[in-house]
Amino acid sequence: MKKAILVTLAVLAALAPLPAAHGEEPLTYTVLLAGGPESNEIRIWLTPDGRTYVIDSIYQLEVGGDVCEHPAGNTNELVCQAPQVAAFEFNADGGDDVARVTSTVHIPVSMRGGPGADKLVGGAGPDKLLGGEGPDRLIGREGDDVLLGGDGNDALYGGHGNDTLRGGPGADELNGGSGENHLEQ
């Protein structure tokens, strides 16, 4: 069973975990990160012991539930229990946002840029990166990724894996990297 936790810069809605019925899969979560009206920088990585995901931001993060928490009162950082996290989603708003996921993160990641010049960098798993309005830079890295530039002059780099890159309106630069890739202006 999958549940979602919303981690935002201003508003939070979290679903408390429900016990799994006998014979069902253990409960997992999708961690949802929502940007605010200003430029932001979000970074997500897995600790070397593989037990914890760390999320940090230049803005305060609020969270509820018992999967993610602030370490030692640092409200700009969250730690999440890795076995209970199935995916990450980041939705930017206004401003020039930067969202980076390190190559230690192998679960699905979905990032959506808003208006502005956004830089979205995926992890080692299957990523879906959507640039939005403005000149965006999308980097898929490892995994079979989908990169959609949106409006503006975008730069899309697939990396390793079988990637799909679509530039959208504007003068776009597309580089699939290694693998069997599909590129479309």
What are these regions (language model features)?
Residues 35, 91-92, 101, 111-113, ...:
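Glycine-centered beta-turn/loop sites at beta-strand termini
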Residues 21, 156-159:
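Intrinsically disordered, low-complexity cationic segments
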Residues 18, 182-185:
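Intrinsic low-complexity/IDR segments
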Residues 22-105, 118:
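Extracellular lectin-like interaction modules
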Residues 1-23:
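Secretory targeting and sorting signals
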